[in-house]
């Protein structure tokens, strides 16, 4: 089976470099793409779909030139091909209203403020990946090293 995919979208190269460093932990188990715009990410979405692969998580900045992260994640949420994809919004400038809009419009699963604490960020990604793998019925045994054990235990306990 092909590795699940994660897409990271941020217009700031230093943030993408930080994401690349922090997500290194997952690289053996998932393919990770780094995009500087929503347009670039949309091309990756089409490639993933054309190959019939899983898009597990999108990590996206909120404030970007052109299409905002909320707009982009809203479009992904409305795209039947990726409705089960987990969405994490990164932002350093969001107001309370922005956050509410992101939850309502884009159905984000997690929110991380910039700057973030590395351990907390990795745990959020780990939890989202775990939820996706379980919801899609992917054999989780291949991914045990990178999955969130508490989420895995809770979900498996509730299904038996």
Name what the model sees in each region.
Residues 114:
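A Lys-centered signature of the CheY-like receiver
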Residues 13-38:
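Two-component/phosphorelay signaling modules centered on CheY-like receiver
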Residues 64-65:
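Receiver (REC) domain active-site loop signature in two-component systems and cognate sites
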Residues 10, 61:
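Active-site residues of response regulator receiver
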